[in-house]
Amino acid sequence: MLARRLIPCLDVRDGRVVKGVRFRDHEDVGDIVDLARRYAREGADELVFYDIAASARGRTVEPEWVSAVARELDIPFCVAGGIRSVDDARARLFAGADKISVNTPALEDPTIIDRLAAEFGSQCVVLGVDSRMIEGAWRVHQYTGDPDKSFAGHRRTLDWIGEGVDRGAGEVVLNCMDQDGVRDGYDIAQLEAARAMCSTPLIASGGAGRKEHFKSVFELAKVDGALAASVFHKGVIEIGQLKSWLDGEGIRVRP
């Protein structure tokens, strides 16, 4: 396996970075470009930006702030939010994004994955999966950026990951909703199950609270990267220090 990636996640709403707990009660944490610049300086391997309200509001992530971020960064970044067509994706890639992530739009029309992969290559296409245990099974949720519209669909999480990869997704980000923002560790069981059947790079999301949580998810779930938000936003963990610690623990990370 290649060196593991550490990826700050920036949830965007109304032009600002916000953070909630279990996808609820979001608070403002800062300016998009300022935080992007800070994380690049601290040693982040890449960044992920989710416009969390875009799908629920029937719009698409704004290319203006994508361009503003691109002008400041020399590391890769991925954007998501209401991307429903090849033209939507092309505009965001031309604005400077390196990858496009699809979540709710892909659940509504799975062929968007095929079309994006055919047009831009699988390396540009990320499948975002928001998952929670419902009646003994992990199920995919839609419109998770809006509490009034969010719901669990009929798809089981592992089945959907398999379908997304078969359709051409080159990477999967598994957002474990019950772990989101609570800082008590990643959902190792769910991530292990996903790892067992996912042949593409798998990124863990939801639950980081201590540096030991990163070590555990890399060692036990064998994920390729770990997404985190609140611990980075609030300075609980500094990325450069985390990399040094992980390296000392035998986890291969990027310089």
From Swiss-Prot:
CDD domains: HisF
Class of the enzyme per the UniProt entry, highest EC level: lyase
Keywords, alphabetical: Amino-acid biosynthesis, Cytoplasm, Histidine biosynthesis, Lyase
Top-level division of the source organism's lineage: Bacteria
Pfam family, one: His_biosynth
Compartment(s) of residence: Cytoplasm
Pathway(s) served: Amino-acid biosynthesis; L-histidine biosynthesis; L-histidine from 5-phospho-alpha-D-ribose 1-diphosphate: step 5/9
Annotated active site: 11, 130
Residue ranges crossing the lipid bilayer per the database entry: none
GO molecular function, one term: imidazoleglycerol-phosphate synthase activity
Gene Ontology BP terms: L-histidine biosynthetic process
Enzymatic reactions: 5-[(5-phospho-1-deoxy-D-ribulos-1-ylimino)methylamino]-1-(5-phospho-beta-D-ribosyl)imidazole-4-carboxamide + L-glutamine = D-erythro-1-(imidazol-4-yl)glycerol 3-phosphate + 5-amino-1-(5-phospho-beta-D-ribosyl)imidazole-4-carboxamide + L-glutamate + H(+)
EC number, UniProt record: 4.3.2.10
SUPFAM superfamilies: Ribulose-phoshate binding barrel
One of the record's GO cellular component terms: cytoplasm
InterPro entries: Aldolase_TIM, His_biosynth, HisF, IGPS_HisA/HisF, RibuloseP-bd_barrel
Major localisation: cytoplasm
Protein family (similarity comment): Belongs to the HisA/HisF family.
Subunit structure: Heterodimer of HisH and HisF.
Described purpose of this protein according to its UniProt entry: IGPS catalyzes the conversion of PRFAR and glutamine to IGP, AICAR and glutamate. The HisF subunit catalyzes the cyclization activity that produces IGP and AICAR from PRFAR using the ammonia provided by the HisH subunit.
Protein known as: Imidazole glycerol phosphate synthase subunit HisF
Species of the source: Maricaulis maris (strain MCS10) (Caulobacter maris)
Lineage, uppermost ranks: Bacteria, Pseudomonadati, Pseudomonadota, Alphaproteobacteria, Maricaulales
